Each structure stands twice: as structure tokens, then as C-alpha cells.
UniProtKB/Swiss-Prot annotation:
Main function: Transcription repressor essential for hematopoiesis. Functions in a cell-context and development-specific manner. Binds to 5'-TAAATCAC[AT]GCA-3' in the promoter region of a large number of genes. Component of several complexes, including the EHMT2-GFI1-HDAC1, AJUBA-GFI1-HDAC1 and RCOR-GFI-KDM1A-HDAC complexes, that suppress, via histone deacetylase (HDAC) recruitment, a number of genes implicated in multilineage blood cell development. Regulates neutrophil differentiation, promotes proliferation of lymphoid cells, and is required for granulocyte development.
Region (Required for interaction with RELA): 140-257
Alphabetic keyword roster: DNA-binding, Metal-binding, Nucleus, Phosphoprotein, Repeat, Transcription, Transcription regulation, Ubl conjugation, Zinc, Zinc-finger
Residue(s) carrying Phosphoserine: 20, 56
Stated name of the protein: Zinc finger protein Gfi-1
GO molecular function: DNA-binding transcription factor activity; DNA-binding transcription repressor activity, RNA polymerase II-specific; enzyme-substrate adaptor activity; RNA polymerase II cis-regulatory region sequence-specific DNA binding; zinc ion binding
The protein's assembly and partners: Interacts with U2AF1L4. Component of RCOR-GFI-KDM1A-HDAC complexes. Interacts directly with RCOR1, KDM1A and HDAC2. Also interacts with HDAC1 and HDAC3. Interacts (via the zinc-finger domain) with ARIH2; the interaction prevents GFI1 ubiquitination and proteasomal degradation. Interacts with PIAS3; the interaction relieves the inhibitory effect of PIAS3 on STAT3-mediated transcriptional activity. Forms a complex with EHMT2 and HDAC1 to promote 'Lys-9' dimethylation of H3 (H3K9Me2) and repress expression of target genes. Interacts directly with EHMT2.
Amino acid sequence: MPRSFLVKSKKAHSYHQPRSPGPDYSLRLENVLAPGGADGTSSAGGAQTEPRGRLSPESQLTEAPDRSSASPGSCEGSVCDRSSEFEDFWRPPSPSVSPASEKSVCPSLDEAQPFPLPFKPYSWRGLAGSDLRHLVHSYRPCAALDRGAGLGLFCERAPEPGHPAALYGPERAAGGAGAGAPGGGSAGGGAAGGSGLGLYGDFGPAAAGLYERPTAAAGGLYSERGHGLHADKGAGVKVESELLCTRLLLGGGSYKCIKCSKVFSTPHGLEVHVRRSHSGTRPFACEMCGKTFGHAVSLEQHKAVHSQERSFDCKICGKSFKRSSTLSTHLLIHSDTRPYPCQYCGKRFHQKSDMKKHTFIHTGEKPHKCQVCGKAFSQSSNLITHSRKHTGFKPFGCDLCGKGFQRKVDLRRHRETQHGLK
């Protein structure tokens, strides 16, 4: 291949190499900026100015040029022949000016006279991170989520006075500057911060124990499982939204009643259960069966049971039910399906509720207590039957002789022994 072709090819690809201005580049630039002479003096004002082509881009952002010597509307001494009305907004390119010098010819934003408000451009390298925070908008989808120490969701501003975070004492608020707090370590290291976790404890798998949370509203009937969350004594149910957000973030969790061992998926469900079942006040009683309730709405829902017809019949034994769910549970008896075994004796049950009632025999727990005589029972149905002794209510009556009974089993026995019916 001819050597001349190689030389031409090398010159054709010379744009890969960085260009450096020639020796007469600055001289030509000064001539363009100051046509009156090469020494930088202007023929109009006569003031001594520094050639603008030698200024760096950063200096143009932070330093405004001095235009006190020339009038804003004057185009005298410039390279353009346009009207002076648009002098401060646009300057046409010159054939003898390079692209680098063409940028320096354009006036800075401080020279734009028609704008009523002054514009101060920022040099981003000259500002600290704290000075730029007002330019960034924070995204806060949930106010309770940006306090998760183990998840790196802290927020710098303090919580509102009515926020659940204010329920924690000042000693925990001061501990938020530990390893899990912002500035005290990485986001992933919050779980190992110990006392530095201002609001939460260890969120790891090792914290899957039971943590009792005494409250004034529930009388110490709560227990939390799965996250090791701690709340101050007397905080009450105001931290329930906080616990719920944590449960959603960490992917699961359950809340167990320490009185009857019933498990709920949300703290609100546990609170309603404690208030209705273990608060000790059930002033609303059913006139048909004598069953008592803690709320009037629960009594109204229960009265619908007595008015409904038994439209769901079992095809095996002919027993009728008012709800399809009750019939489905009844069919487990005929299929002999017992999926719930007792952890103490191995006895199996059709329903989980029956298995829990059976475990009270082994543990000796009697969570249901009579408010009149103080007698305790392991099952709520036994407490309901016992309460009829104090009220004298007999909901089961014989249709042959009219005699009433407090229990259905007593009515069945009466029909068999006195009337010969089965």
C-alpha cells in the first residue's frame, strides 16, 4: 500500500487526538472581542477589561462581568450590524471565531435585562451537600415507614407531635444516632445497632419469639411475635399502625392473645378480640338464648341467627344448618377428616377451635370467668350455660308439656324419659 495513502488516512482520523489552540489563537480571540486594538481596549468606553476568551466556564457562572462602562442597548464596537434592541440576547457567530470562543462571546445570564428577578446560577462543585437539599424533593409514601432502623428508611426531620413515634421516650429518641441511624452506618447495619436503634429492635430471624406488650387499654393481654418490637408501657393501641407497617415491610407476622392463645394477623383484630372477649363487661344479652355480648352491634348480628331458617341440610344424616359454612364443617364428621392434632396427647379434631379448647385440659387454663360468682371455665360455651343459672333463663322448652330447660341436652333427655321420644 502506498505510504502517501497511509499518511492521508492518519490525517483523516486526526479528530481522535485532542486539539490544542495554536500560538496565534489568543491573539485572534482578543482581536474579535476588542476590535479597537490587540491590547484589549474598547474604542467606545476606553475601559481596561480582561479578555473574556481566557475565562473558564466556572468563572462565568460565579462572576458577573462588569458592564458599567458600556450601555446595555449599545452595539457600538461589536462584530454585528444588527439592531441594538437584541444586543444582550444573541450574537451571531463569526467565521473567524472557533466554537470555544463562540460560547464566551454569548453574554451570561446575569446580563439579561428584561428579567425582573435576578438569577444567580450555581456552581455545583462550589456548594456543599447541605446547600443543595432544598432542591431535592423527598418521597414519603408512609410516615411510619421512614423510621425503620434496620431498613434504612430514616427521615431527617422530626416526627409530628401526634405521630406514634412521639410515644417512645426521649432515651430512645436519643439512641437513634447509633449504628442504625442516618450517618451512623450503612442501611444494612441497622439491625446490629443494639441500643442505637431508636425505635425498633432486631428484625432478624432470631427475634421470632414472643414479646409481651402491656397496655393500659387491654390490661396486658397483648403479645407480639416475629419482630421483637418494643413499646413503652402505657402507650396503648396508638402504636398499632406502626406495628402494622412493620409487619407489612418484613413480610408476615402474627399477634397472639396470651389469655386464650388465639392468633390474629393484625393488631387491630387482637384489640377487638380482647375488648369483646376478655374485658369482663358483656352487658348486652340475647333474649332468646341468653348469650351475652360486649357490644350492641354484636347482639344485633346474633339475633339474626334465631330468625334465619335452617335451609342447609346434610344429605347423610339429615341435620339442617343456617349457614353453608357450618354445613361444610359438619361434613368433616362424616368424612372422618381430622387435620388438627393435639400437641400433648395426639388426639385429632375436625376444627382448629376444638383442638384449642382441648388443649386447655392439659394446660389447666380457664380463661372464661363468671362475673357473678367468679367460677372459671375453659370454654366460653360452658360459661354461657352457667350464666343461665344466675339469670334463670331456660331457652329450650318441651313442645309436649311446656317444661323449659337451660341446656339442650336436658331437653333431649326429658323427651326420651318422660315422653318416650328419641
